Design a protein with these regions (language model features):
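Conserved, structured core segments of small domains
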Residues: 1-97
């Protein structure tokens, strides 16, 4: 199942810079793992914000929640999830258009 996921990091202004650096490095590693596993399919940054939009794939909403919850920044994330359904005119879909 595919999901459109919006993530914004709400790091506190007075947060520890060393902890921020540690979490940033760990987040890159975990993000790469989720990408290699096919969970994160596509991702875009939002210019000027510490935010992104992505296409994620998981068996169901519970599996998606577990994947998002595995991100090191999870306690600081504002996440919005929109489940997606196939569209018959999707040009990337077999038989689409």
């Amino acid at each position: 199942m595919e999901f459109l996921v919006s993530i914004e990091v709400g790091w506190p202004a007075d947060g520890d810079p060393e902890e921020l650096a540690r979490l940033t490095a760990a987040e890159r590693v975990r993000g790469a793992e989720l990408g290699a596993a096919g969970t994160i399919r596509r991702m875009w940054r939002v210019p000027g914000r510490r935010a992104n939009w992505g296409i994620w794939e998981a068996e169901d909403a519970t599996a998606l929640h577990a994947a998002i919850g595995s991100l090191p920044f999870y306690p600081y994330l504002d996440v919005e999830v929109i489940p997606l359904a196939a569209h018959p005119n999707d040009p990337e879909r077999p038989g689409g258009r």
